[in-house]
């Protein structure tokens, strides 16, 4: 052991400020701050420009353009973008369809599409997503589809999630009480009045699904319910109004291959083995 405590004094260090996020709902709180930091990063790296030609062409529908970074994008007619409350960052290859309203702070990732008549604010949308309806204070990871009408608020959504048309979450209790979140057998006091749902990778919901405040849906779950589903659905679960059962792992893997192939992506052996091991673990 060559460690010498006396040498610690000679080590150069720099104090930095960090934010510790213990839970996913902590990340939602810092959407605005993180997008502000990202704007500085993008501007410094020169990855996205101010796109002056775009601003000149669309000046009547853009508010506070100095707080926007727009890449090589397709913006259809009658899109309103308001960066008064925070930056709007639109990455390359994004399509924003007609009659959509975007409010900062907002980041839309590379290759994503925003459907017509959408309203999106204070959110982070990952790459290659298809987004529609209303979003407020939501983090969505890559390749997730929420194409159709419906509301998502104060929520964290994983990758490769597919929301059926009309899927909507509640982010406020009728009695304005603080929302609790159950994960496995433990209940957490979030101390938040506004809180939506936490959806794992590869979750699918049927049309018209109603998601309660503080709901947690485990990765690989399939939700088919005309009523409010359970607020705590375990991983790889087939959920219906008749009850819960385990998703067949071979069928799940087959669906993942099909889904990714449609988007030009491979479901590789590492990820497949991860889910097979996960299935064996939850079956015990």
Language-model region placement:
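Terminal amphipathic alpha-helical/low-complexity segments used for targeting or macromolecular assembly
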Residues: 1-61, 226-284
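Glycine-rich hexapeptide-repeat left-handed beta-helix
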Residues: 116-117, 127-283
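Extended beta-solenoid/beta-helix repeat architectures
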Residues: 47-158, 173-174, 183, 189, ...
């Amino acid at each position: 052991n060559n460690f010498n405590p006396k040498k610690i004094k000679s080590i150069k260090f720099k104090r930095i400020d960090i934010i510790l996020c213990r839970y996913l709902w902590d990340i939602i709180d810092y959407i605005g701050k993180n997008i502000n930091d990202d704007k500085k990063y993008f501007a410094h790296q020169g990855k996205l420009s101010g796109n002056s030609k775009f601003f000149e062409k669309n000046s009547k529908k853009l508010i506070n353009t100095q707080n926007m970074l727009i890449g090589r994008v397709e913006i259809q007619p009658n899109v309103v973008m308001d960066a008064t409350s925070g930056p709007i960052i639109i990455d390359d290859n994004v399509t924003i369809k007609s009659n959509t309203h975007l409010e900062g702070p907002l980041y839309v990732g590379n290759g994503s599409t925003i459907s017509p008549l959408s309203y999106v604010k204070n959110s982070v949308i990952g790459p290659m997503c298809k987004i529609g309806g209303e979003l407020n204070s939501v983090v969505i990871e890559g390749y997730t589809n929420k194409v159709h009408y419906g509301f998502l608020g104060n929520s964290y959504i994983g990758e490769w999630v597919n929301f059926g048309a009309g899927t909507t979450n509640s982010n406020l209790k009728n009695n304005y009480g603080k929302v609790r979140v159950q994960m496995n057998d433990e209940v957490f006091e979030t101390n938040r009045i506004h809180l939506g749902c936490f959806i794992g990778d590869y979750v699918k919901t049927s049309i018209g699904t109603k998601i309660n405040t503080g709901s947690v849906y485990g990765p690989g779950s399939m939700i088919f319910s005309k009523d409010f589903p359970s607020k705590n659905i375990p991983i790889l679960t087939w959920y219906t109004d008749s009850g819960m059962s385990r998703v067949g792992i071979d069928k799940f893997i087959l669906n993942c291959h099909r889904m990714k192939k449609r988007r030009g992506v491979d479901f590789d052996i590492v990820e497949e083995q991860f889910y097979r091991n996960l299935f064996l673990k939850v079956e015990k």
